[in-house]
């Protein structure tokens, strides 16, 4: 995977860990509370043939985000620049840490 991070393409990205609560019947509810952390990073479509082979048609609903190192985890919610919904439209599905950058694969929520 190529780690190309171009400053001129940086955009504001917000991320927030979900809050999980368990009901009396054992059901788990996911909510998004708190203030999302903000970072500037590069968002790209998934282009590698390996990623497209792994994810198939899902790859059309996925993006690659390259951000400064931070506290990112699979399942965290993501808002891209200009998205102002209460719940995040994107979820982190993979995290790869590099020397000074982190690569996130995000998928649009159904």
Language-model-detected regions and their locations in the chain:
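Active-site-proximal polar cores
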Residues: 1-29
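Short, conserved turn/kink motifs that form compact alpha/beta structural patches or helix kinks used as
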Residues: 27-110
């Amino acid at each position: 995977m190529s780690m190309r991070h171009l400053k001129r393409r940086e955009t504001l990205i917000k991320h927030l860990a979900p809050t999980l609560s368990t009901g009396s019947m054992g059901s788990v509810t996911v909510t998004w509370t708190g203030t999302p952390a903000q970072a500037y990073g590069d968002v790209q479509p998934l282009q590698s043939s390996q990623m497209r082979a792994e994810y198939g048609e899902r790859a059309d609903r996925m993006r690659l985000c390259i951000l400064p190192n931070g506290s990112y985890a699979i399942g965290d919610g993501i808002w891209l620049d200009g998205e102002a919904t209460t719940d995040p439209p994107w979820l982190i599905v993979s995290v790869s840490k590099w020397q000074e950058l982190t690569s996130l694969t995000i998928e649009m929520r159904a």
